[in-house]
């Protein structure tokens, strides 16, 4: 299956593609679409709308997002859809433009989950403007490279005082008995994390959100990561702290995620 790139619903022009390659300013969201629907679509669109106002001063609006998504996925039973916001009026020497951004849609084959399990290493880092899912992602790739050079799969971010926030491409949750603890810290509010949280009561799992220090992770029974491509994946180690897989509980977390039905585009 090929990838199709459209900008405002039309074939992408070379100038617009060149601008995005040269000016790293914008926001995006991405998710799996099946039969014209996606889980957490309302959350994805609300977050993208807020990012548009934050970065450009104006948003195309939900109706336009939905129109462009429908054009992008037409004729596809399943795909991975990315919506990116950018403005050719904004550049390194001309940063002041305020107005509606353009919307690039990329429909491509659905990716596999990140992994069946991961071992991660803690890295002191905080993403710039962490509440935004922005296109400045060099630091995330660099962190993953650094983790793999140390023999791990990925990196878990902590601040200078040792407080846990998020992973490179994912949110993290910690397990103790039949409860989930979400770290409280500056981070991107993940849609998959929100869907799991919404469904935990239905599967008999309690939850709390509070600050979590790296030096207390050994007191938990387990950990997991989540993002749009990987609803639930066990974290089997954080540096030298090893965790059991807890497959039964992780299955309940995935059931919590699945309890939110796909929403039509």
Model-identified regions with their sequence ranges:
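Phosphate/pyrophosphate-binding loop motifs in nucleotide- or prenyl diphosphate-using proteins
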Residues: 83
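Short secondary-structure junctions
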Residues: 73-80
């Amino acid at each position: 299956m090929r990838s199709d790139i459209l900008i405002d619903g039309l074939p992408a022009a070379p100038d617009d593609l060149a601008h995005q390659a040269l000016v790293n300013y914008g926001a995006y969201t991405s998710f799996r679409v099946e039969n014209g629907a996606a889980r957490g679509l309302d959350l994805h669109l609300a977050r993208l709308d807020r990012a548009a106002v934050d970065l450009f001063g104006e948003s195309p609006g939900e109706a336009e997002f939905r129109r462009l998504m429908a054009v992008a996925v037409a004729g596809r039973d399943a795909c991975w859809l990315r919506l990116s916001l950018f403005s050719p009026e904004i550049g390194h020497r001309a940063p002041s433009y305020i107005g509606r951004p353009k919307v690039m849609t990329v429909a491509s084959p659905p990716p596999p989950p990140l992994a069946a399990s991961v071992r991660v290493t803690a890295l002191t880092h905080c993403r710039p403007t962490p509440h935004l899912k922005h296109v400045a992602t060099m630091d995330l790739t660099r962190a993953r490279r650094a983790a793999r050079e140390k023999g791990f799969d990925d990196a878990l971010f902590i601040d200078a005082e040792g407080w846990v926030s998020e992973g490179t491409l994912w949110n993290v949750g910690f397990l103790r008995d039949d409860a989930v603890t979400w770290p409280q810290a500056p981070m991107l509010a993940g849609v998959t994390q929100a869907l799991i949280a919404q469904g935990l009561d239905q599967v008999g799992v309690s939850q709390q959100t509070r600050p979590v220090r790296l030096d207390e992770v050994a007191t938990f029974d387990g950990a997991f990561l989540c993002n749009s491509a990987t609803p639930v994946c066990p974290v089997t180690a954080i540096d030298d702290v090893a965790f059991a897989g807890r497959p039964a509980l992780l299955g309940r977390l995935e059931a919590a995620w699945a309890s939110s039905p796909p929403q039509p585009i």
